[in-house]
Amino acid sequence: NPGDEVVYHEPCYVSYMPGTVMAHGVPVPVATRKRDDFSLKPEALAGVLTPNSRVLILNFPTNPTGGIASGEDLAGIARLCVEHDLIVISDEIYSELRYDDQAHVSIASLPGMRERTILLHGFSKAFAMTGFRLGYACAPAPLIDAMMKIHQYSMLCAPVTSQAAALEALENGAASMERMRQSYHERRDFVVRRLNEIGMDCHSPGGAFYVFPDVSELLSPDG
């Protein structure tokens, strides 16, 4: 409804804010910090929640920081979502691209969250299928029914060729995905090391395929 607040953590994927505005919502960003590995801290989330808060958008691993929410932070976030009756849109498109033996935990798996979570995923990242434009949503039936009222008139259906490619990826793509993940891991280590060696303060991302160096010390006063 107009005036409903949609909370999301920043830095973030570029579409969250304009998508909220297009739906007549009020965007409410919450900053994340390098010192916290760009995890959303429950206390930061609690500080922006109001009686108008309706939705929380999560994206872990995060575009563009590669940040990953710790289990402790996710549990605290889940408790706040239950307490404030929030719907969570959990964008987990990078969930397979995690490094340093970190297991993925979906907030939908935590107590009280399955019935209030819309989980978004797709084939673009883990299977390198960005051009196929194929994704999916998992949510309670009433939420899916509401989403379909818009989806059936705007998106129609996924191309048959994309669906066939996705089936092949699911049935036979695990080994290729793991090779790619290992390659990304090696590239991450190289890029982060080299950026730090030349004077950039670069956080080592826990997932996704981005690095997010701090260049503030290299900028002139006028940017």
Functional labels for PLM-detected ranges:
Residues N1-G223:
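PLP-dependent class I/II
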